[in-house]
Amino acid sequence: MSRSGVAVADESLNAFNDLKLGKKYKFILYALNDSKTEIIVKETSAEQDYDKFLEQLPENDCLYAVYDFEYELGNNEGKRSKIVFFTWSPDTAPVRSKMVYASSKDALRRALNGVSSDIQGTDFSEVAYESVLEKVSRAAGSH
C-alpha cells in the first residue's frame, strides 16, 4: 500500500513476472483504476518497436510502464536486456493526476523486483530511445 492508500493489483505483479521470467511481453502499461484505489494493467504488448511503446504514452495523462529494454553493447559484445520502470507524468496532465501518481509510485516500484533503471518522463525527449539508452548503459556500467 502506498502513501496515497493505493494498492497494487495481483494482475499487475503477474504481468510483470510474465515479462521478466517468461519474456511474454515487451512492455506493460499500468494505470490507476477509476476509483484511484488500485494500480492495474492498462495494456500489455509483445511489440518490439520502441516507437510503438512511446505512441502508447498519453499526451495529457499519467501512467506507469515497464519496458524490457534491449540494446547492443559496443565492440561486438552482443546484446543486453534491462527492465526499465517509467513514471510518465507529462506537464499537461491534470495536477490531481500527477499528485496521485507521484504518491502511489513507490507501492508499484517496490513490488517489481528486477527493475534495473527508473526513468521519470515529463515530455517525450526524456523517454526517447537515446536518453533511456544512456541511462540504462550507465547504470549497467558499460560506459
Swiss-Prot record:
Q: Which CDD domains match?
A: ADF_cofilin_like
Tell me the Gene3D superfamilies matching this sequence: Severin
The places in or outside the cell where this protein is found are:
Cytoplasm; Cytoplasm, Cytoskeleton; Nucleus matrix
* GO terms under biological process: actin filament depolymerization; cell division
Report whether Nucleus shows up as a keyword of the record: yes
- Known SMART domains for this protein? ADF
Q: Name one Pfam family in it.
A: Cofilin_ADF
Identify the GO cellular component terms for this protein: actin cytoskeleton; cytoplasm; nuclear matrix
Which ranges carry the ADF-H domain?
5-137
Q: Record's superkingdom? A: Eukaryota
- Transmembrane region(s): none
Q: Which family does it belong to?
A: Belongs to the actin-binding proteins ADF family.
Q: Write out the function statement from the record.
A: Controls reversibly actin polymerization and depolymerization in a pH-sensitive manner. It has the ability to bind G- and F-actin in a 1:1 ratio of cofilin to actin. Binding to F-actin is regulated by tropomyosin. It is the major component of intranuclear and cytoplasmic actin rods. Required for accumulation of actin at the cell division site via depolymerizing actin at the cell ends. In association with myosin II has a role in the assembly of the contractile ring via severing actin filaments. Involved in the maintenance of the contractile ring once formed.
Q: What is the designated name of this protein?
A: Cofilin
